[in-house]
């Protein structure tokens, strides 16, 4: 029994941790409370269900930090990346996936693995014995959250996350909208036409901003403050920061030409991205919102091309919980006060599907090695994996710790390279070349250790 690894939570991190440990020869039990106990955001009992966007963001492994993380996870035989690649949708230079088949594939492969078992039960305490990884994500249950708070002696940290709406494709007016990826990015025609675009002139944009600002919004409970992760700000919060903010953010009109009016430059553009392989659903890019349902329908139908739109899902808001990991976790993601317990995924203060799965990958491998009595080399800080784990387990300032996406700002500088915008391309290539070499060497040492 003591050699079995228990993983609490079957999201991105928990699924990847289970796969990695099982592939190392460890018997794994996944404790997933769904569907017995549901959450605000989840709709199924599948493992690795995508509840927000369907995008894994950029797949460029030379000029983008998250693309580099994709590369490192593929090199490590990652389940999440394998399933994402199998259910990839056209999205320009991004990696977007068909969310339901993706989750079904992850679920099926874990259920089929001879060393993995899955049990539908809620874990509400921090066990004192055995080997555990808690990957309960931002929607950690109240009972478990209370147990973590009691153990750490500190209030759980939290921010608010918002979900974008999804539209039925056949209700979009294509006499006003058109298909084009920004700057025609992509190697195939399908990639170059991966986004659906709805243009606005200045008057339409100003009216849209007015409607956003006036719309009814979800109220917070007493004692809750509206702290958001910057990468997932509700559009109405962005609008409150300035009337031009959206036009320089998700509604920027650059790199696009309207074939219906090729000589007219749009003042702003709303983009929609395909949400499933059939092309029957599109999500509105960057339009996560906390508006009430009635207000959402009214406001979004003012967008040219969406006047008669029907919504498969409206947006919403939920509270996300995360640990002050620099204070509570050691360099191997173990709880300092309970070293038999590791944490992984979004609850550790990384933000995003890919980052969560990446920390699950490391937690699974680290736990497997510990159970087998093997000492793994330190994860190289020059890799994307190493930059992330270093940040959450000590590199970040504990007093101001907030959820973080992977980015090149977490990487150590490369000597002798020009700073600023002019040197950025060479600098990013140097980061990714160095990272790939470091990660490849670590994997080889880890396998032979």
Swiss-Prot record:
The keyword Cytoplasm applies. It holds the Pfam family GIDA. Its main location: cytoplasm. It is found in: Cytoplasm. It catalyses: uridine(54) in tRNA + (6R)-5,10-methylene-5,6,7,8-tetrahydrofolate + NADH + H(+) = 5-methyluridine(54) in tRNA + (6S)-5,6,7,8-tetrahydrofolate + NAD(+); uridine(54) in tRNA + (6R)-5,10-methylene-5,6,7,8-tetrahydrofolate + NADPH + H(+) = 5-methyluridine(54) in tRNA + (6S)-5,6,7,8-tetrahydrofolate + NADP(+). FAD binds at residues 9-14. Keywords: Cytoplasm, FAD, Flavoprotein, Methyltransferase, NAD, NADP, Transferase, tRNA processing. It is an enzyme of class 2 (transferase). It comes from the Bacteria. SUPFAM superfamilies: FAD/NAD(P)-binding domain. Its EC number is 2.1.1.74. Its cofactor is FAD. One of its GO terms (biological process) is tRNA wobble uridine modification. One of its GO terms (molecular function) is tRNA (uracil(54)-C5)-methyltransferase activity, 5,10-methylenetetrahydrofolate-dependent. InterPro entries: FAD/NAD-bd_sf, MnmG-rel, MnmG_N, TrmFO. One of its GO terms (cellular component) is cytosol. PANTHER family: GLUCOSE INHIBITED DIVISION PROTEIN A (PTHR11806), METHYLENETETRAHYDROFOLATE--TRNA-(URACIL-5-)-METHYLTRANSFERASE TRMFO (PTHR11806:SF2). Belongs to the MnmG family. TrmFO subfamily. Catalyzes the folate-dependent formation of 5-methyl-uridine at position 54 (M-5-U54) in all tRNAs. This is Methylenetetrahydrofolate--tRNA-(uracil-5-)-methyltransferase TrmFO. The gene is trmFO.
């Amino acid at each position: 029994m003591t050699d079995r690894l228990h993983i609490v939570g079957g999201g991105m991190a928990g699924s990847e941790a289970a796969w990695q440990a099982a592939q190392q020869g460890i018997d794994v039990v996944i404790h997933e409370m769904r569907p017995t106990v549901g959450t605000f955001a989840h709709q199924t009992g599948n493992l690795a269900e995508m509840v927000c966007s369907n995008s894994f963001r950029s797949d460029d492994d030379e000029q983008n930090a998250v693309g580099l993380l994709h590369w490192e996870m593929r090199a490590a035989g990652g389940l999440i990346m394998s399933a994402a690649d199998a259910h990839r949708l056209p999205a320009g230079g991004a990696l977007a996936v068909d969310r339901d088949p993706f989750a079904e594939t992850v679920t099926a492969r874990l259920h089929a693995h001879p060393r993995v078992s899955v049990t539908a039960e809620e874990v509400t305490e921090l066990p004192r014995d055995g080997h555990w990884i808690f990957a309960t994500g931002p929607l950690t249950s109240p009972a478990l959250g209370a147990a973590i708070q009691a153990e750490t002696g500190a209030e759980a940290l939290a921010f608010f996350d918002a979900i974008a709406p999804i539209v039925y494709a056949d209700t979009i007016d294509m006499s006003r909208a058109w298909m084009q990826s920004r700057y025609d990015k992509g190697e195939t025609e399908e990639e170059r036409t991966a986004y659906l675009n709805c243009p606005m002139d200045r008057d339409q944009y100003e009216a849209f901003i007015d409607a956003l600002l006036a719309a009814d919004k979800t109220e917070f409970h007493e004692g809750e403050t509206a702290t958001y992760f910057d990468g997932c700000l509700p559009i109405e919060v962005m609008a409150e920061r300035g009337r031009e903010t959206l036009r320089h953010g998700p509604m920027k009109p650059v790199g696009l030409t309207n074939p219906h009016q090729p000589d007219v430059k749009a003042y702003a553009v709303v983009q929609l991205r395909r949400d499933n392989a059939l092309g029957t659903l599109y999500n509105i890019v960057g339009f996560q919102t906390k508006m009430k349902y009635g207000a959402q329908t009214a406001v979004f139908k003012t967008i040219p091309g969406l006047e008669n739109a029907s919504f498969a899902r409206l947006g919403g808001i939920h509270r996300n919980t995360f640990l002050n990991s620099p204070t509570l976790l050691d360099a191997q993601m173990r709880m300092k006060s309970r070293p038999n317990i590791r944490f992984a995924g979004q609850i550790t203060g990384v933000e995003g599907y890919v980052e969560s799965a990446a920390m699950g990958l490391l937690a699974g491998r680290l736990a497997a090695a510990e159970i087998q009595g093997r000492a793994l080399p330190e994860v190289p800080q020059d890799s994307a994996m190493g930059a992330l784990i270093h940040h959450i387990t000590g590199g970040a300032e504990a007093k101001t710790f907030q959820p973080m996406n992977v980015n090149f700002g977490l990487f150590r500088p490369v000597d002798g390279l020009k700073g600023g915008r002019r040197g950025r391309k060479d600098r990013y290539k140097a980061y990714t070349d160095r990272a790939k070499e470091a990660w490849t060497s670590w994997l080889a040492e880890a396998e032979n250790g």
